[in-house]
UniProtKB/Swiss-Prot annotation:
Record protein name field: 2-C-methyl-D-erythritol 4-phosphate cytidylyltransferase
Organism: Burkholderia lata (strain ATCC 17760 / DSM 23089 / LMG 22485 / NCIMB 9086 / R18194 / 383)
KW Signal (keyword) present: no
Catalysed reaction equations from the record: 2-C-methyl-D-erythritol 4-phosphate + CTP + H(+) = 4-CDP-2-C-methyl-D-erythritol + diphosphate
The protein's annotated pathway: Isoprenoid biosynthesis; isopentenyl diphosphate biosynthesis via DXP pathway; isopentenyl diphosphate from 1-deoxy-D-xylulose 5-phosphate: step 2/6
Name of a matching Pfam family: IspD
Site positions for Positions MEP for the nucleophilic attack: 159, 215
GO MF annotation list: 2-C-methyl-D-erythritol 4-phosphate cytidylyltransferase activity
Amino acid sequence: MTPRLFALIPCAGTGSRSGSAVPKQYRTLAGRALLHYTLAAFDACSEFAQTLVVLAPDDSHFDARRFAGLRFAVRRCGGGSRQASVLNGLLELAEFGATDHDWVLVHDAARPGITPELIRTLVATLKDDPVGGIVALPVADTLKRVPAGGDAIARTESRDALWQAQTPQMFRIGMLREAILRAQREGHDLTDEASAIEWAGHTPRVVQGSLRNFKVTYPEDFALAEAILARSTNAS
């Protein structure tokens, strides 16, 4: 049986670094909620069986009317960390017929620059891989190490062979669930899915990502994301 594809969008964060009273995934960019662009990219990939959005149980900002016409489901099962939200979402996917052998693509809600083309490139590259992998970019900037709380450079780090992880991150549902459970049992709260897979002893692959697929994190990121999205909307 051919493994099916599922998308999981953890959307339970508060976006405290963005400087906004409203969680950043609901901020309006180029006329739409930031989250809308992520959902629209996966909606355009009809090969996906389901896209599941994981919200915080007490999320009062989500309004389904802002995403009318897009195909997705919502579960209010977000946890206290990204790792917990993803794990809870993986467990909920069983309700939609997902099996351990099926693929899940976990994507940050705050990466509105994702495109159907990049999603399909990732799937095409990894669909026969025994582990899975992520989209990422080779590090282009010079890296400086600065002690915590300080402002003086301790040393320059080599950027050779370093890649900056992005999302989506694509793994078998069962493998990812067990990897996160193992990390959780051993007291680790990991910041992406590939870290859990690595912790379990597997070797994920990297697929070339895109500069436009950056994560909206700081206040100045919104203007850049809006310019990119407005240009894409006008071009279409």
